[in-house]
């Protein structure tokens, strides 16, 4: 099981975004069933309240970077996402299904009871890279609050040969007063020289774009642009 303040899934057919407000969080559980079991047959009980998993979030059937959502199919493995208040406000929680139940581990309940926190985010990327060389996006996340927290972001790309495409999602758990850095690289093809592409990084409280021009490929060792005698 995992605890996340937001989840990442499609918000359009060709882009991803984060879902979840400051006073919300998600409990994510991967399940495998031997017979048909509807998502609504699963319940989470905590603090006298009963919660059912979200059957749909955004426009997608998958949660980045976890995997496909669970639907009622015999022998299927997938993820269910319970939308819960943040903090949970309960010292225990139980996941139940027809014929069984499981008490959540203490570490999971502790994570669900964390207070919301705030992050300062800095995004850097080169202005240009040679074709066939990696362009690295660097995201620095500083936890400016008083509680440990998980930062969630989503990365999309436009160009050089696609109009819009999801790249990946990131989750960083950062202690109060600490800073962590996440990096992601994309390597343009040699035939993309002269074009450009854009990283679009989004999170709950903001978004940043970085356009990167693509230069001619660098010459490999031993190659020369002119003959000599």
List the model feature ranges, each with a label.
Residues 1-152, 161-181, 185-229:
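Conserved functional micro-motifs across diverse proteins
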């Amino acid at each position: 099981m995992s605890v996340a303040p937001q989840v990442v899934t499609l918000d359009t057919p060709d882009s991803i975004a984060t879902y979840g407000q400051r006073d919300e969080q998600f409990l994510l559980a991967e399940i495998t069933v031997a017979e048909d079991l509807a998502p609504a047959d699963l319940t989470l009980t905590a603090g006298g309240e009963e919660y059912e998993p979200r059957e749909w979030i955004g426009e997608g059937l998958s949660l980045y970077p976890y995997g496909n959502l669970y639907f009622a199919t015999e022998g299927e493995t997938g993820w269910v996402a319970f939308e819960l208040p943040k903090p949970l406000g309960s010292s225990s929680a139980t996941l139940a299904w027809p014929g069984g139940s499981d008490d959540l581990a203490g570490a999971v309940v502790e994570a669900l009871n964390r207070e919301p926190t705030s992050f300062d985010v800095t995004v850097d990327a080169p202005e240009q890279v040679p074709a066939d060389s990696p362009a690295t996006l660097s995201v620095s996340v500083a936890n400016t609050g008083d509680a440990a927290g998980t930062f969630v972001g989503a990365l999309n790309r436009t160009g050089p040969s696609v109009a819009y495409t999801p790249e990946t999602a990131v989750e960083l758990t950062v202690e109060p007063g600490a800073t962590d850095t996440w990096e992601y690289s994309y390597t343009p093809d040699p035939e993309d020289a002269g074009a450009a592409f854009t990283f679009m990084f989004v999170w709950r409280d903001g978004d940043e774009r970085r356009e990167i021009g693509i230069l001619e490929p660098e010459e490999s060792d031993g190659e020369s642009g002119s003959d000599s005698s």
